[in-house]
From Swiss-Prot:
Substrate binds at residues 76-78, 119-120. Signal peptide: none annotated. Catalyzes the conversion of (8S)-3',8-cyclo-7,8-dihydroguanosine 5'-triphosphate to cyclic pyranopterin monophosphate (cPMP). This is Cyclic pyranopterin monophosphate synthase. Pfam families: MoaC. Keywords: Lyase, Molybdenum cofactor biosynthesis. InterPro entries: MoaC, MoaC_bact/euk, MoaC_sf, MoCo_biosynth_MoaA/MoaC, Mopterin_CF_biosynth-C_dom. Homohexamer; trimer of dimers. It catalyses: (8S)-3',8-cyclo-7,8-dihydroguanosine 5'-triphosphate = cyclic pyranopterin phosphate + diphosphate. Belongs to the MoaC family. Gene3D superfamilies: Molybdopterin cofactor biosynthesis C (MoaC) domain. It comes from the Bacteria.
Amino acid sequence: MMNQLTHINASGEANMVDVSAKAETVREARAEAFVHMAPETLELIVSGQNHKGDVFATARIAGIQAAKKTWDLIPLCHPLLLSKVEVQLEAIPAANENETNMVRIESCCKLAGKTGVEMEALTAASVAALTIYDMCKAVQKDMVISQVRLLEKTGGKSGHFKVEA
């Protein structure tokens, strides 16, 4: 684990990191999020019966748009020229009464650049989850968004990171 916060200067003030001297490398990051819901809500999504429209298509586009706007949402993020943004959604019915029905969201962002795309991947997964909540809140308000996390990142000075299985 790094022991220095890169966005804090010697005076303790928040600053945008200067990446101008860094070499361009291919960088990629994957993130995930889950939306837990009632079986009836998941069935509305899967069957395409949600009155607001195609939940997965809307969440996918929202996640892609969010990744592209991360620099506008997170104050010290750099505007990036993303070469790839992918958002995948999977309906996961509960296997037994001890589990919940859920949607798993996985995002992937990629570029050739001077800074990483972890925040873009996390933002894509988060906003896709929020969009699912928004589109389904009329039928269920107690859905839970959980486990928003970075799964893997490659490229850059810190190298390869992957969550242990």
